[in-house]
C-alpha cells in the first residue's frame, strides 16, 4: 500500500470536512435535537400536570356536587317544614274563623229567637185581650186589668 498524494489529499479533505461539520453543522443539529428532547420532556411533564389537574378538578367537582346535594336536601327539608307550618297556621285560622262565624250565627239566632218570643208574647197578649173582650162582651178596662195582662205575658 502506497501512501501517495491522493490519499494524503483525501485525508486532509476528510479532516477539513470533519472539522467543518464539527464547527458549523454539528452544533445546530445538537441544538435542534436537545431542543426537541426538551420539548418532548416539557410536553410529557405538561401532560402529567394536566392529568393531575384533571383528577383534582374531578375530585373538586364531586365534592361540590355532594355539597350541592346536601344543601338542596336541607333546603327541601326547610321548605317542607315551612309548608307544614303554613298549613297548620291556615288550619288554625280557618278553625278560628269557623268558630267566630258559628258564634255570630248562634248569637244572631238567639237574638232572633228572643225577638220572635217577644213579638209572640205581644201578639198573644193582644189576642187574649181581644178574646176576653169578646167573651165578656164589654170592654175591659186596661188600667184596671193591667196586672192580669202582665201576669199573662209573664207566663207566656
Curated annotation (Swiss-Prot):
Any one GO molecular-function label of the UniProt entry: proton-transporting ATP synthase activity, rotational mechanism
GO cellular component, one term: proton-transporting ATP synthase complex
Keywords carried by this UniProt record: ATP synthesis, Cell inner membrane, Cell membrane, CF(0), Hydrogen ion transport, Ion transport, Membrane, Transmembrane, Transmembrane helix, Transport
Protein location: Cell inner membrane
Matches recorded under Pfam families: ATP-synt_B
Topology in membrane: Single-pass membrane protein
Annotated InterPro entries: ATP_synth_B-like_membr_sf, ATP_synth_b/b'su_bac/chlpt, ATP_synth_F0_bsu_bac, ATP_synthase_B_chain
TM region positions: 7-26
Keyword Transmembrane: yes
SUPFAM superfamilies in UniProt: F1F0 ATP synthase subunit B, membrane domain (SSF81573)
Function: F(1)F(0) ATP synthase produces ATP from ADP in the presence of a proton or sodium gradient. F-type ATPases consist of two structural domains, F(1) containing the extramembraneous catalytic core and F(0) containing the membrane proton channel, linked together by a central stalk and a peripheral stalk. During catalysis, ATP synthesis in the catalytic domain of F(1) is coupled via a rotary mechanism of the central stalk subunits to proton translocation. Component of the F(0) channel, it forms part of the peripheral stalk, linking F(1) to F(0).
Subunit structure: F-type ATPases have 2 components, F(1) - the catalytic core - and F(0) - the membrane proton channel. F(1) has five subunits: alpha(3), beta(3), gamma(1), delta(1), epsilon(1). F(0) has three main subunits: a(1), b(2) and c(10-14). The alpha and beta chains form an alternating ring which encloses part of the gamma chain. F(1) is attached to F(0) by a central stalk formed by the gamma and epsilon chains, while a peripheral stalk is formed by the delta and b chains.
Family: Belongs to the ATPase B chain family.
Protein name in the entry: ATP synthase subunit b
Organism from which the protein derives: Pectobacterium atrosepticum (strain SCRI 1043 / ATCC BAA-672)
Gene responsible for this protein: atpF
Amino acid at each position: 500500500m502506497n501512501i501517495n498524494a491522493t490519499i494524503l489529499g483525501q485525508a486532509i479533505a476528510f479532516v477539513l470536512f470533519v472539522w467543518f461539520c464539527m464547527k458549523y453543522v454539528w452544533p445546530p443539529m445538537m441544538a435542534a435535537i436537545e431542543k426537541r428532547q426538551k420539548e418532548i420532556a416539557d410536553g410529557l411533564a405538561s401532560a402529567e400536570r394536566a392529568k393531575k389537574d384533571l383528577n383534582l378538578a374531578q375530585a373538586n367537582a364531586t365534592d361540590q356536587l355532594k355539597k350541592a346535594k346536601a344543601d338542596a336536601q336541607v333546603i327541601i327539608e326547610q321548605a317542607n317544614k315551612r309548608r307544614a307550618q303554613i298549613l297548620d297556621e291556615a288550619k288554625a285560622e280557618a278553625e278560628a274563623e269557623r268558630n267566630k262565624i258559628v258564634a255570630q250565627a248562634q248569637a244572631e239566632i238567639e237574638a232572633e229567637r228572643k225577638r220572635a218570643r217577644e213579638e209572640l208574647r205581644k201578639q198573644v197578649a193582644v189576642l187574649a185581650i181581644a178574646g176576653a173582650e169578646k167573651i165578656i162582651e164589654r170592654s175591659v178596662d186596661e188600667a184596671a186589668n193591667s196586672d192580669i195582662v202582665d201576669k199573662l205575658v209573664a207566663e207566656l
